[in-house]
From Swiss-Prot:
NCBIfam families: PRK02853.1 (NF002769). Transmembrane segments: none annotated. InterPro entries: UCP032146. This is UPF0262 protein Mmar10_1128. Pfam families: UPF0262 (PF06793). Belongs to the UPF0262 family.
Length: 160
């Protein structure tokens, strides 16, 4: 197995977890998926070599990682309580709202300050996600950032 097989080649967000979203969130989701597929490191613990397909969902207030091989052979499923991520996701949503409002008419300095705060909260969520995945799935920081964006998209839609 080569290191290049330690990657996601397909990602699906559960349609049942998805509802109508706003334009900005939908754009962020599409960009996160494209960036994730372009470059990621993703390796479930165990003996099964990739590349992998990943389905993300929210079921019964839990985050579901359904990991499969590229041919849809099941590898492993993981469920995580949303509680530890909930505060960070909520903070991220609030900062994103402020950012989108500021982009319309705020001075550049204010937009930059809000964007720095937004990236900081996003990094915090990504770090927490990596910590939650330890012993289950090995991901690099950029992959965790993109997955956090997708988890936020699911969380936003599950809450609406």
């Amino acid at each position: 197995m080569s290191q290049s097989d330690d990657r996601i080649v397909r990602i699906d967000l559960d349609g049942a977890s998805m509802g109508p979203g706003d334009v900005n969130a939908d754009h962020e989701r599409r960009v996160a998926i494209a960036d994730l597929l372009e470059g990621n490191r993703f390796r479930p613990d165990g003996e099964v070599d990739g590349p992998y397909a990943l389905r993300l969902a929210i079921e019964h207030d839990r985050l579901v990682f359904d990991v499969r091989l590229e041919d849809d052979t099941p590898v492993h499923g993981f469920m995580f309580a949303l509680g530890p991520l909930r505060r960070i996701v909520k903070d991220y949503f609030l900062i994103c709202e402020s950012y989108y409002e500021a982009v319309r008419d705020a001075p550049l300095e204010r937009i930059e300050a809000i964007d720095m705060a937004r990236r900081g909260v996003h990094n915090e969520g990504s770090t927490l996600l990596r910590e939650r995945l330890v012993g289950k799935i090995d991901v690099d920081f950029d992959t965790a950032r993109r997955l956090f964006t997708l988890i936020c998209a699911l969380h936003r839609r599950a809450a609406s």
